[in-house]
């Protein structure tokens, strides 16, 4: 098994974990927890990534928690934090987990240098000492300990609130750190919404993020039955709050592409993700496009926005036989296909 660079540097420092009950969190993408479990008392995972949760939920040896907040009781006395792409998400996870685990908790932080992992030095200052103990593979390995009482964590304090103006409608948006387009109206989403036809029936908002697209669709087309899905628990929590803030109804749930969805959508609408961590990542969107026909009703329609450089039309044409470009500007294109 080839481990990620942060896991490889952690593997060099296994002595730090001996005798510990380790809770792993953050931007973890490989099977390293199985290796780590051989060297510590117990290993558990807290993840906001539904795909990663499903991967580990099948194994009894490592307990895996999924959600936007760790609410379960744990005996962990050490956190292994894989530094996430967004600094604000790192701060959110750190504050939440230390509030849960409490004073005297040890922490190891690993991450690629270009991800900004050095920020942990200032971020952890109010909790206790932390120092870098290793550097390799353009990554850093920090160890520290919480010597101060962590403040009480209230998730509601972490929602960023902002407004989106679309046509004559004002949408109140509530967004947690780590959610796509946190705090702003994405220009691709705006072009997508400007291009959408009148919607009816069962509509899927794939990769719902903070819930902007779904909320606008439901506001303009109040009779639709709206499903909103995302792989991120932070996005799910944000979309639920955004719907609530606008007195809108929709079904919001985690799904690894179509793993938990139905198969009778009149419309699948998406501003699909193509960044996973610091790397460009297409596989989930490819699955979205390839399997769209079997998840649409007769004459059902797929409509998505994408950066112009992404090679989605050939995938859509292979799945549907045709791909239309409904609109474009200097950065984005709106693609459509009908079953």
UniProtKB/Swiss-Prot annotation:
CDD domains: AdoMet_MTases
Domain of life from the UniProt record: Bacteria
Family matches, as SUPFAM superfamilies: S-adenosyl-L-methionine-dependent methyltransferases (SSF53335)
HAMAP family: 16SrRNA_methyltr_C (MF_01862)
Quaternary structure note: Monomer.
Role noted for this protein: Specifically methylates the guanine in position 1207 of 16S rRNA in the 30S particle.
Family: Belongs to the methyltransferase superfamily. RsmC family.
Protein name: Ribosomal RNA small subunit methyltransferase C
Gene: rsmC
